[in-house]
């Protein structure tokens, strides 16, 4: 009898536990059903399909549900070049691309124009919010636009359209000399090229074996690189973004087999 009572007690407890777990789990998934899945039409931004967006502390792959371009992605199998890119910036990229806020220069570099901050997971000032306790955005240059699908949407005032040009060039080894804290901003100042391309296009890059012998010698830290003249204040960050934007394509749109862009 005691054995039967024990079995019944365990069975009842297990049943209640499963029901309760299912209830709370379903509550947490309601937000996904109501605000994310099949809600692309709830986002009314004219150019959303032709720019990249950022999703701060949101459900992974929200952009995929909405079928829009994003710098965020939970995908373990990606191109080797993506892994190399993040590694060059000193950023760990394991199974997902989720660039931290301190590498804010990566946003304009990747032509990221909008940021989505889900309102259902925390109030302003919490770590789940792009807005700090003083009401300021945690990255420079972002301005509140509107709220849709329970997402606060911010626009990048330092946005650089896709397809922009550089007039300065640095070798990969020069870029390695920049501290990780400023590498995302350094990307906005000069195009980073491997040594063979620096040499191949020396009439443009200014490369010469004599000029770069220190960089490729035993003491590369003694090389006088233009990266030492890059400034990383907020005002300089704004200036370099505006400069890149002035030298960008006048129009850009995706096509079935790539993209179409116009540059005047």
Predicted regions and their residues:
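Cytosolic-side transmembrane helix boundary signature
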Residues: 1-4
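Extracytoplasmic/lumenal acceptor-recognition loop(s) of multi-pass membrane glycoenzymes
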Residues: 6-25, 35, 39-112, 159-222
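Short conserved active-site loop signatures built around small residues
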Residues: 29-31
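Flexible, solvent-exposed extracytoplasmic
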Residues: 106, 111-264
């Amino acid at each position: 009898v005691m054995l039967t009572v024990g079995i019944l007690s365990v069975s009842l407890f297990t049943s209640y536990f499963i029901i309760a777990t299912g209830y709370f789990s379903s509550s947490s998934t309601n937000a996904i059903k109501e605000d994310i899945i099949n809600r692309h039409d709830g986002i009314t931004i004219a150019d959303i399909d032709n720019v990249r967006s950022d999703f701060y502390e949101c459900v992974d792959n929200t952009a995929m549900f909405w079928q829009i371009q994003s710098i965020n992605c939970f995908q373990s199998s990606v191109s080797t070049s993506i892994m190399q890119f993040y590694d060059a910036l000193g950023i760990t990229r394991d199974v997902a691309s989720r660039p931290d806020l301190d590498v804010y220069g990566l946003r304009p570099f990747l032509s990221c124009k909008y940021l989505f901050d889900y309102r259902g997971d925390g109030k302003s000032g919490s770590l789940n919010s792009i807005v700090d306790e003083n009401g300021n955005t945690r990255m420079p240059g972002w301005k509140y636009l509107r709220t849709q699908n329970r997402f606060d949407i911010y626009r990048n005032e330092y946005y650089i359209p896709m397809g922009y040009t550089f007039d300065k060039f640095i070798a990969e080894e020069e870029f390695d000399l920049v501290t990780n804290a400023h590498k995302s901003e350094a990307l906005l100042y000069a195009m980073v090229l491997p040594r063979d391309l620096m040499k191949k296009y020396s009439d443009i890059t200014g490369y010469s074996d004599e000029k770069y012998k220190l960089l490729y010698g035993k003491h590369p830290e003694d090389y006088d690189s233009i990266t030492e003249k890059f400034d990383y204040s907020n005002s300089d960050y704004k200036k370099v973004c505006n400069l890149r934007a002035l030298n960008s394509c006048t129009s850009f749109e995706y096509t079935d087999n790539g993209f179409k862009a116009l540059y005047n």
